[in-house]
Amino acid sequence: MSVSKTNRIALFIDGANFYATTRTLGLDVDYKRVLKEFESRGTLVRAFYYTMISEDQNYVSLRPLVDWLVYNGFTVVKKVAKEFVDSAGHRKVKGKLEVELAVNAMELAKHIDEMFLFSGDGDFRSLVEAVQRRGVRVTVVSSFAAQPPMIADELRRQADAFIDLDTLRTKIGRDPSTRSM
């Protein structure tokens, strides 16, 4: 594949969905290698990472990753999860970042040629279609190889291209001998 450095690209990583997919695949992601891999595909305009944080834990477990991402070129979009107790007395966490991701994608569409959406969530099908109408090529990065598949069929069909995360294992997987993010 011939890649032009004038191809302006942006990454949109749905953190919760990406984490679930990589965990299902047993893939430990090295985010430095993610940047390197996608910078080789064009001029990286922006790399977004979307994540929920818990009110009571102040995102202690996510803090090292979030800090590393911020200091290494990612735009991290955080939202506090709303916690509640359902009618059965079970503690539930509610909150999504689909709207924030969609707004950022629509705003950035006029500045990019290609969007890489790291999510398998079918709720993004309409967003993909809207961005395509603005002349942006959309590649969805998720997994059909995972069991169960982590990509909604309608999202995969709408995208211009699909990359299975399993095929990127050697390019973005963490080298066990290193400790970088």
Protein language model regions, located:
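Ligand/cofactor pocket segment of small-molecule handling proteins
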Residues: 153, 157, 161, 166
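Short, structured coil segments at secondary-structure junctions
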Residues: 72, 134, 155-158
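Acidic, metal-associated active-site segment
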Residues: 101-111
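Conserved residues at the C-terminal ends of beta-strands
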Residues: 50, 118, 165
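A charged, well-structured terminal subsegment
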Residues: 164-181
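Short loop/turn motifs at secondary-structure junctions
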Residues: 43-45, 111, 158
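Domain-level signal for Mg2+-assisted phosphodiester chemistry and nucleotide/NA-binding surfaces
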Residues: 1-97, 107, 122, 137, ...
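Active-site histidine-anchored catalytic micro-motif
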Residues: 110-153
